[in-house]
Every structure is written in C-alpha cells, then in structure tokens.
Amino acid sequence: MDVLYFAWVRERIGVAKEQVSTDACTVADLVKELSAREERYQVAFQDMAVVKVAIDQVLVSLDTPLGSAKEVAFFPPMTGG
C-alpha cells in the first residue's frame, strides 16, 4: 500500500510517500510497525492524538482495520477559513 505523509509529519519522516508491505491489521498496528523501523518514525508518531489518519481518503481512527487499503495518509489537524 502507499503511505503518505503531510506537513510536519512528512518533515519528521523525511519522505512524502512510500510503498509499504505490511502484516498490520489496524492503523495502530501499522503505526507500531513503522515506529519500530527507525527513530524518525517514532518522533513523527510519538503523539498520535495530534495526527489524523485517512484510509483511501476517508478519515479513520487508530483501531480501524486496514482491510484492502490502497492508501494510508498521516497528517496534522488542519483548520480553514
């Protein structure tokens, strides 16, 4: 699946997009798996209360199953006006 990172999440991880093969069942499992890779992922995901997640462009929670997701995106909350 494609994993996308936006704004300061991208800056901390150092890439905007990567292809990831995973056995993770949920978003939380994917975060744990990525965080185990390198410290830069740990830094980006250290406070998941301030990171939003979307699967195939639909906002989801950490306990959401990945299922057959083609894309998972991580980004900070945004405001508009």
Residues of each region from the PLM?
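Ubiquitin-like/PB1-type beta-grasp interaction modules and other compact soluble beta-rich domains
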Residues: 1-80
